[in-house]
Regions:
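Short, low-complexity disordered leader/linker segments with a strong preference
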Residues: 1-44, 288
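Extracytoplasmic small-molecule ligand-binding "clamshell" domains
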Residues: 42-121
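Periplasmic-binding protein-like
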Residues: 52, 140-147, 222-262, 285-288
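Bilobed "Venus flytrap"/periplasmic-binding protein-like clamshell domains
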Residues: 54, 75-90, 122, 144-198, ...
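Extended ligand-binding regions for polar small-molecule ligands
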Residues: 82-91, 151, 164-165, 173, ...
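Alpha-to-beta junction loops
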Residues: 93-95, 111-120, 165-166, 202-215, ...
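Acidic, polar ligand-binding/catalytic clefts
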Residues: 95-161, 239-241
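A ligand-binding cleft/hinge motif common to bilobed small-molecule-binding domains
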Residues: 105, 121-131, 178-181, 207-242
């Protein structure tokens, strides 16, 4: 009887030990963000972006120019956002891991902890601040018009001169909201991404895209039939400070990550940002 009891006790202890190991493995697997370690032993900085929003970010087939492999993909990500992300990761002694996420999924991915940060050309609006925190700006993006070079809109000297245009922009952006400032505008439904916006303009579905300078400049650089139209400050699109400040979205209360990133960004000037952006515009795939 004693032997049977000891045998059963051994089986019980073995089962309990296995169960504890499973739980421990599950807890370890659930640790995300900066706690994750790469094969190198470094922490991993998980950054989300669309990888389809040149010149801020795009996808390419190789690591040419310093592109970073997209997690779970054979593609690589590059662009202004990746250049900034690499600087941040290097300063933090972390390995950079890029996650390709649709625009509408970026903030939720930050909130859930799927990624540590969204570096994706995101304006620091009050609405977004309800769900995420933002770092100091890593770019300042003036709102402009993107039109066909041979269109009447190309001669506009003010937003008022765009009267009666057929316009659209990207979904859930401040650009789409700015369209309402154009007199008698015909506002089409918003488009999911920047490539879709360009197609709509080139195909004649619309004759005006409202966007920011980097996006318009990159589109015109890659498409000779398009041009960017800028306006004097008193005749341009009326925007708030938060509309033009582009920040990095991080989880609310993550002061450690915010401080680490802000330390790097505070050491950079607007001229530094513009220099990196110009480099990104020249390197975008369609610019070659």
């Amino acid at each position: 009887m004693k032997g049977v009891f000891l045998m059963n006790l051994k089986k019980f202890l073995k089962a309990a030990l296995c169960g504890a190991m499973v739980v421990a493995m599950a807890v370890t697997a659930g640790c995300g963000g900066g706690d994750k370690k790469a094969d190198s032993g470094k922490k991993v900085l998980k950054v989300g972006m669309e990888c389809a929003y040149a010149p801020y970010n795009w996808s390419q087939s190789s690591a040419d120019g310093g592109a970073v492999k997209i997690a779970g993909s054979n593609e690589y990500a590059y662009g202004y956002d990746v250049m900034i992300a690499k600087k941040l990761a290097d300063s933090m002694g972390a390995d950079l891991e890029i996650h390709k996420i649709e625009w509408d999924g970026l903030a939720p991915a930050v909130v859930s902890g799927k990624i540590d940060a969204a570096i994706a050309g995101m304006s620091t609006t009050s609405k977004r601040k309800e769900s995420v925190d933002f770092t100091k700006p890593y770019y300042y993006a003036t709102v402009v018009a993107l039109v066909k070079k041979d269109s009447p809109q190309a001669q506009a000297k003010s937003v008022a001169d765009l009267k009666g245009s057929i316009a659209t922009s990207q979904l859930n952006t401040i650009w789409y909201d700015q369209i309402d400032q154009v007199p008698d505008v015909k506002k089409l439904p918003a488009i999911d991404n920047v490539p879709g916006m360009i197609v709509a303009l080139k195909s004649g579905k619309c004759n005006l895209i409202v966007t920011d300078i980097p996006t318009a400049k990159a589109a015109a650089f890659a498409n000779p039939d398009l041009t960017m139209v800028t306006f004097p400050e008193d005749k341009g699109f009326k925007t708030s400070k938060e509309d033009v400040e582009i920040g990095i979205a991080i989880k609310k209360g993550n002061k450690e990550l915010a401080d680490a990133m802000n330390k790097v960004l505070s050491g950079m000037t607007e001229a530094d940002f513009n220099k990196i952006m110009d480099e990104a515009i020249k390197k975008q795939p369609l610019a070659k």
